[in-house]
């Protein structure tokens, strides 16, 4: 289990730089980026990237606008600790 932050953007023009793209972030939400770690080494060794080792990710049912994060959202980065518990165990 990997806790990550996902963003939903408006239209992103090709070739835009980091500073220009920051203003296109519309929503922020949590995502569980699942990895089947025992499959990754053999898949990467084949040179084609992830196929079976990266199944579908799970997104939070709620998204917020960046301004709702207040001081925790600075320079398009969330400045908060994300903790993952599995069945109550960190």
Language-model features, listed with the residues they occupy:
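Glycine-enriched loop-and-adjacent helix/strand subsegments that border the catalytic/binding cleft
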Residues: 1-90
């Amino acid at each position: 289990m990997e806790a990550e932050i996902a963003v939903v953007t408006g239209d992103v023009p090709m070739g835009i730089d980091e500073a220009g793209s920051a203003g296109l972030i519309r929503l922020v939400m949590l995502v569980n980026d699942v990895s089947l770690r025992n499959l990754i080494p053999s898949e990467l060794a084949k040179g084609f990237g992830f196929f079976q080792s990266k199944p579908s990710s799970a997104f939070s049912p709620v998204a917020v606008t960046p301004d709702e994060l207040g001081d925790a959202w600075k320079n398009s980065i969330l400045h908060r600790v994300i903790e993952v518990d599995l069945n109550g165990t960190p």
